[in-house]
């Protein structure tokens, strides 16, 4: 199924005519994924204003100075053929179906309610998972913003 995120998958299954009790009893985990370009080793440190980082989804705690924000090297190198990117990296949202989630499915909860429950359970959405890859220096903020919804 193609959906924008893991919680929307449950809506899609309902729209396909599956009864809520069948969904709740048979689905144990949902994964959503996106591919982002991986920064080449020639990556360069980037300066982005704090308000823009917060607007992208970083928290104040994320901006503690313990990591460096990298972007693609504008000139690139031989390995990346001047693009600043080399290869791809997966960004994932993995949502196990908990008992609380099953109850919401049985009551025909919409994707927004399911999303809220997922956050309460500590499940990272695609954007949050992408921002983690940015903090790790694997991909750029621009790339994560391009392939995820906020």
Predicted stretch roles:
Residues 1-150:
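Short, flexible helix-loop junctions that flank or precede catalytic/ligand sites
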């Amino acid at each position: 199924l193609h959906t924008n995120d893991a919680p929307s998958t449950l809506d899609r299954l309902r729209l396909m005519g599956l009864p809520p009790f069948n969904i709740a009893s048979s689905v144990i985990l949902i994964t959503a994924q996106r591919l982002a370009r991986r920064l080449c080793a020639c990556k360069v440190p980037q300066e982005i204003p704090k308000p823009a980082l917060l607007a992208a989804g970083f928290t104040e705690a994320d901006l503690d100075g313990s990591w460096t924000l990298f972007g693609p090297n504008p000139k690139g190198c031989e390995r990346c053929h001047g693009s600043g990117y080399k290869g791809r990296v997966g960004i994932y949202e993995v949502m196990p179906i908990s008992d609380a989630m099953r109850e919401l499915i049985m009551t025909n909860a919409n994707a927004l309610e399911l999303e809220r429950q997922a956050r309460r359970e500590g499940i990272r959405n695609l954007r949050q998972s992408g921002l983690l890859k940015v903090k790790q220096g694997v991909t750029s903020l621009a790339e994560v913003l391009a392939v995820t919804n906020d």
